[in-house]
Swiss-Prot record:
The keyword Zinc-finger does not apply. The keyword Nucleotide-binding applies. Belongs to the heat shock protein 70 family. The gene is SSE1. GO terms for biological process: autophagy; proteasomal ubiquitin-independent protein catabolic process; proteasome-mediated ubiquitin-dependent protein catabolic process; protein refolding. It comes from the Eukaryota. CDD domains: ASKHA_NBD_HSP70_ScSse. One of its GO terms (cellular component) is fungal biofilm matrix. SUPFAM superfamilies: Actin-like ATPase domain (SSF53067), Heat shock protein 70kD (HSP70), C-terminal subdomain (SSF100934), Heat shock protein 70kD (HSP70), peptide-binding domain (SSF100920). Keywords: ATP-binding, Chaperone, Cytoplasm, Nucleotide-binding, Stress response. Its main location: cytoplasm. This is Heat shock protein homolog SSE1. Gene3D superfamilies: 1.20.1270.10, 3.30.30.30, 3.30.420.40, Actin, Chain A, domain 4 (3.90.640.10), Substrate Binding Domain Of DNAk, Chain A, domain 1 (2.60.34.10).
Amino acid sequence: MSTPFGLDFGNDNSVLAVARNRGIDIVVNEVSNRSTPSMVGFGQKNRFLGESAKTKQTSNIKNTVGNLKRILGLDYDHPDFQEESKFFTSKLVKLEDGKIGTQVRFAGESTTFSATQLNAMFINKVKQTVETETKANITDVCIAVPTWYTEEQRYAAADAARIAGLNPVRIVNDITAAGVSYGVFKTDLPEGEEKPRIVAFIDIGHSSYTCSIMAFKKGELKVLGTAWDKNFGGRNFDRAITEHFADEFKTKYKIDIRENPKAYNRVMTSAERLKKVLSANTAAPFSVENVMNDVDASSQLSREELEELVKPMLERVTEPVTKALAQAGLTKDDVDFVEIIGGTTRIPTLKNSISEAFGKPLSTTLNQDEAIAKGAAFICAIHSPTLRVRPFKFEDIHQFSVSYKWDKQVEDEDHLEVFPANSNFPSTKLITLHRSGDFSMEANYTNKEELPPHLDANIAKWDITGVQIPEGETSVPVKLKLRCDPSGLHIIEEAYSLEDIVVKEEVPLPEDAPEDAVPEVKEVTKTVKKDTLEITAHTFTLADDKLNTLIEKENDMTAQDRLVAETEDRKNNLEEYIYTLRGKLDEEYSDFASDAEKTKLKDMLAKAEEWLYEDGFDTIKAKYIAKYEELAAIGNVIRGRYLAKEEEKKQALRAKQEAANLAALSEKLAAQRSADSEAKKDATPEGDAQMDLD
């Protein structure tokens, strides 16, 4: 049985949650942090994933990749790439399929990985983290992604999960997952015919800003409107601060950090810390030791100066709010509460701008960092066949109208708008077409002029085959089940031909008919399912052979990572054993080894230490094991003698203690008997005592 796993796939950090019988828990990683850096790095032998990638980022700057979700499913020639490339320190390249990849040094070679592979590496890492921490089997996941993700990017996220060995039961909009978290755990929501509670959610994370208007009743949620700014996030504030100090340091210290990626990254990391400090203080010092050219750079920044630096960004705060309200058909006065989530909403000036946009105070009843992950875990639990959860219905919203188009064979029309903009999903529509043979269908966004710039209007294509025309007919009716699934992906779920058959049915008798009346039978024509047709989908998902190849590559790299980790553990165990045994030979083991044994073992330890730092500094796991066992063959004999003597001492001490306890018990019993005897004497009558004397 798989434990439901929810992943809030953040741009800077990701949060992991699992659903269990007692509730939903956040999973801590190997260093007990409640979030994990969304980052992968590459070394001479193995990969560095999550925390280890972050730790080595400064020293491994060109081989460390962050901002993973921003390049997933993105074309190299897309205008967004120019904005994204500013935040990467590794080399980004154009792949054969036109997508973005990164070129790094891995295992001593120049290697290129696709964005899907990079995301799969990280997802595999967090899967292992959840399995280790929960000691549970993890196969199903609900991944929370940005609302602005296209169909192609959602397929890419699902493919990355499959490469990592997971079944993506749902790709959910991150802000919708936060809404689910709100709706599930709120106990005071309206019921029945009561007016729904209207809540605006503001999520400003590391790289983007989303506003969503939702309506809540007990056990249900409906998204009314959503808008976003893809390039408004914490990293933009960090970059503004970094650029400010880049100019200052160029004048003050005659250094240009823009020409040194490592220096620029160090300043940007310090800028992020400064931003957080200024959330609680009006001014703060800023310093970076040995930033470049042996220069220790220092300065300071006030909150007022920061607000001036990001003033152009703050002017964009109201736009997503206005658009989301317009899509919902509401005004700011209709909003009951404004919930803020995401780390960047902690910036005071940003909070003030949001509050002013709605004209009301902000609410922070949700955990700003963990609400999305918990909502995703609950959604995953809904799909679990073994875990019971409280009933909760939620519907998201189509941002753009989607039409289906087909070959024009019999009908006058060759397209139909199936899923209008602002309609809810998941949803299913049935349509019937008259076909003269096999045919193809396409799904496209209806109005190209409504789409964001450079968004491809094509969504998917399907080939429908197996259409058989009855003898004497020129066409056959075909019914198609069109669906926008819970992940927002457009599919044709089923296709089958129809036929008319004549059946006999009894005509119901009137109520006043005699008891012996015989019902009349008439023939009626019914349309029934005839042949199930074959559907071949052409979507953005990876082909099976390509997917299997990438799964195999990921498994190989995972095995290599595991081998390197195990080898390092064996090396550390050997080093620790050498130092520990050497110290104990002159202390607690001294009386349990002959002079010859001590001399021999000390010589072996010295040679083993020399080997460890020379020929054995970088070798295979088996050699560390062999060297350890060679030393342990003698060391364990001496240790055995020591432990035997210690056990003998314990036995003697135990026997002595038992004897002392027995003696104490005997003394106590004797004292008790004496006391009882004295008490008996005191109780004897005086007359009886005299009579006994006579």
